[in-house]
From Swiss-Prot:
Similarity field: Belongs to the metallo-beta-lactamase superfamily. Glyoxalase II family.
SUPFAM superfamilies noted in UniProt: Metallo-hydrolase/oxidoreductase
Any one GO molecular-function label of the UniProt entry: metal ion binding
Enzyme Commission number(s): 3.1.2.6
Designated gene of the protein: HAGH
Residues bound to Zn(2+) 1: H74, H76, H130, D154
Cofactor: record remark: Binds 2 Zn(2+) ions per subunit.
Annotated positions of the N6-acetyllysine modification: K61, K88, K201
Protein name in the entry: Hydroxyacylglutathione hydrolase, mitochondrial
GO cellular component: mitochondrial matrix
Length: 280
C-alpha cells in the first residue's frame, strides 16, 4: 500500500506544447486528470474538469494566464465536484457542460455548439453513454498547423472506454466510431483518468496477437514507473490497440463471439466489467 500512496504523490504534471495551444496535464485525486488549455496568443485559458480548484488557481498563476472558462465533461463528482468552489475563487468564469446536474453551470453545451478560448475554437460533442449528458471538447487553432486536441472525459480512455452507467452499447459505438473516430487521425486524446495499464492488459486479453497492444503496454509501464502521464494518445493509435475502437475488426468480433460492432461492444464491455487484472 505504501507504494500506492507514494506513487500518487509522485504523479507528475506534463506540458504539451505543439504550437499556439498549450496543454498542461494536471494529475488530480488518485487517478484523475484535469487539463489547463492555454491559448499562447492571448494568454487566456480554459480548465477541463477542475476537481481540485486550488491547484487550478495556482497553475493558472504559475503560467501567467487568465482563466476564463470551465469545460465540464460530465456531472460525476470527480469531474464536476470542484466547479462551485472554483467559481467562488475566480468569479465570472463561464462554466460549460451538457447536463443540468453539473454544479455551477452557466452555459449548456449542445452537440456541435462552439465557443472560443482566446483564439482557440472549442466544439462541444455530445457523447451520451457513461452519463446521459456527457460532452467531449474538440479544440483547434484556426489556421494553425498544430494537431487538434479532444478532451474525452470518461467516454474514451487510452485503450479503453467508460462504463455504460446511463447508456447503451449502441450509444458508445456512435460516440467512439461516428463522433470521435471521424476526427483527424493525429488528434491528441486527453482522457479523464489514468487507467492505461489496466486497459492495455484487458486489450491484450482480447487480442493476444496484437503487437501494438504489447508495445503500448511496455511503454505505459515505463511511464508509470517514473510517475509520468500516459496521455495524450492519438486517435490513430487508439484504432490500433483500443478494443472498444476496434469492434469492427474481425479479431475483436471473434473474441466476443459476434459479427457486428454493437453486440461486440456490448460483449466486450460486459467482459471488461468482470475482468480480473493480472499482475504482470
Amino acid at each position: 500500500l505504501l507504494g500506492v500512496f507514494h506513487h500518487t504523490d509522485l504523479r507528475k504534471s506534463l506540458t504539451v506544447d505543439e504550437g499556439t495551444m498549450k496543454v498542461e496535464v494536471l494529475p488530480a485525486l488518485t487517478d484523475n486528470y484535469m487539463y489547463l488549455v492555454i491559448d499562447d496568443e492571448t494568454k487566456e485559458a480554459a480548465i477541463v474538469d477542475p476537481v481540485q480548484p486550488q491547484k487550478v488557481v495556482e497553475e493558472a498563476k504559475k503560467h501567467g494566464v487568465m482563466l476564463t472558462t470551465v469545460l465540464t465533461t460530465h456531472h460525476h463528482w470527480d469531474h464536476a465536484g470542484g466547479n462551485e468552489k472554483l467559481v467562488k475563487l475566480e468569479p465570472g468564469l463561464k462554466v460549460y457542460g451538457g447536463d443540468d446536474r453539473i454544479g455551477g453551470l452557466t452555459h449548456k453545451g449542445t452537440h456541435l455548439s462552439t465557443l472560443q478560448v482566446g483564439s482557440l475554437n472549442v466544439k462541444c460533442l455530445s457523447t451520451p453513454c457513461h452519463t446521459s449528458g456527457h460532452i467531449c471538447y474538440f479544440v483547434t487553432k484556426p489556421g494553425g498547423s498544430q494537431p487538434p486536441a479532444v478532451f474525452t472525459g470518461d467516454t474514451l480512455f487510452v485503450a479503453g472506454c467508460g462504463k455504460f452507467y446511463e447508456g447503451t452499447a449502441d450509444e458508445m459505438c456512435k460516440a467512439l466510431l461516428e463522433v470521435l473516430g471521424r476526427f483527424p487521425p493525429d488528434t491528441r486524446v486527453y482522457c479523464g483518468h489514468e487507467y492505461t495499464i489496466n486497459n492495455l492488459k484487458f486489450a491484450r486479453h482480447v487480442e493476444s496477437g496484437n503487437a501494438a497492444v504489447q508495445e503500448k503496454l511496455a511503454w505505459a509501464k515505463e511511464k508509470y514507473s517514473i510517475g509520468e502521464p500516459a496521455v495524450p494518445s492519438t486517435l490513430a493509435e487508439e484504432f490500433t490497440y483500443n478494443p472498444f475502437m476496434r469492434v469492427r475488426e474481425k479479431t475483436v468480433q471473434q473474441h466476443a463471439g459476434e459479427t457486428d460492432p454493437v453486440p461486440t461492444m456490448r460483449a466486450v464491455r460486459r467482459e471488461k466489467d468482470q475482468f480480473k487484472v493480472p499482475r504482470d
